[in-house]
Amino acid sequence: MDPNCSCATGNSCTCASSCKCKECKCTSCKKSCCSCCPAGCTKCAQGCICKGASDKCSCCA
C-alpha cells in the first residue's frame, strides 16, 4: 500500500486533492492526480492535479 493513497501500489484509485501517491493510476482525471497531457490537451489539464507530464494521456482522446 502507498501510505499517501487509499489503494495498493499500482492499482486504480481515486485520490484526494492533496494526492502524493506516485505509483497510483487514478481513474478520474478531473478530481484526482494524474499524468497531465501536453499543453495542447486542455481536457486533461482542467481540474487535474498533475503528478507528472505525459505525452500519453487517456483523458486527452
UniProtKB/Swiss-Prot annotation:
- Where Phosphoserine occurs, residue numbers? S58
Detail which positions bind a divalent metal cation 4: C33, C34, C44, C48
InterPro entries reported in the protein's UniProt record: Metalthion_dom_sf (IPR017854), Metalthion_dom_sf_vert (IPR023587), Metalthion_vert (IPR000006), Metalthion_vert_metal_BS (IPR018064)
| GO terms under biological process | cellular response to cadmium ion; cellular response to copper ion; cellular response to zinc ion; detoxification of copper ion; intracellular zinc ion homeostasis; negative regulation of growth
GO CC term, one of those recorded: nucleus
What positions does the entry give for a divalent metal cation 7 binding?
C50, C57, C59, C60
Binding site residues for a divalent metal cation 1: C5, C7, C21, C24
Q: Which UniProt keyword terms apply here?
A: Acetylation, Cadmium, Copper, Metal-binding, Metal-thiolate cluster, Phosphoprotein, Zinc
From the UniProt entry, list the residue stretches annotated as the region Beta. Answer: 1-29
Q: For the region Alpha, what residue ranges are annotated?
A: 30-61
Q: Where does a divalent metal cation 3 bind?
A: C15, C19, C24, C29
Q: Where does a divalent metal cation 2 bind?
A: C7, C13, C15, C26
For a divalent metal cation 5, which residues are the binding ones?
A: C34, C36, C37, C50
Q: Which positions bear N-acetylmethionine?
A: M1
**Pfam families referenced in this protein's UniProt entry, alphabetically:** Metallothio
Subunit field text: Monomer.
What does the UniProt record say this protein does?
A: Metallothioneins have a high content of cysteine residues that bind various heavy metals; these proteins are transcriptionally regulated by both heavy metals and glucocorticoids.
What the record says about family reads:
Belongs to the metallothionein superfamily. Type 1 family.
This chain belongs to the protein called Metallothionein-1A
- The record lists the organism as Oryctolagus cuniculus (Rabbit)
